[in-house]
Amino acid sequence: MKVIFLQDVKGQGKTGDVKDVADAYANNVLFKKKLARPATTGNLKQHEAHERKAAEEAKQALQDAQALKEKIEKETIIVSTKTGEGGRVFGSVTSKQIADELKQMGYKIDKRKIELEHPIKTLGVTKVPLKLHNEVTATLNVQVKEA
């Protein structure tokens, strides 16, 4: 019996796959647990439409991320901190502070998208990578200056 998998099933198929499985397995396991549905012509058309819509949404998300990258790479964030002797920063500039500054500028970027290996502990300009999409990474200039 041909079925369309609604969820990943170990050893059988992944979400969206259309495969042939034993009738008893399909009826007694896959359909009862709502892991799959029969691959009728109506269900196949609905499945194809769903896949097309998902592909369009993914394409739009990629375009939005690329547009955001172009805007962000033109920006420079200025963070003022307390400093001691020799320009040493008390504390550090974290990804949360950078996310807050971006929010004030009108960008909604989660602090987990900011790929800061170590908090910034020096004065000057630092280039910080932002993971906007699986395929799009922007570079943001963060300037740390004395308060």
Curated annotation (Swiss-Prot):
Binds to the 23S rRNA. The keyword Ribonucleoprotein applies. One of its GO terms (cellular component) is ribosome. GO terms for biological process: translation. This is Large ribosomal subunit protein bL9. It comes from Exiguobacterium sibiricum (strain DSM 17290 / CCUG 55495 / CIP 109462 / JCM 13490 / 255-15). Keywords: Ribonucleoprotein, Ribosomal protein, RNA-binding, rRNA-binding. It comes from the Bacteria.
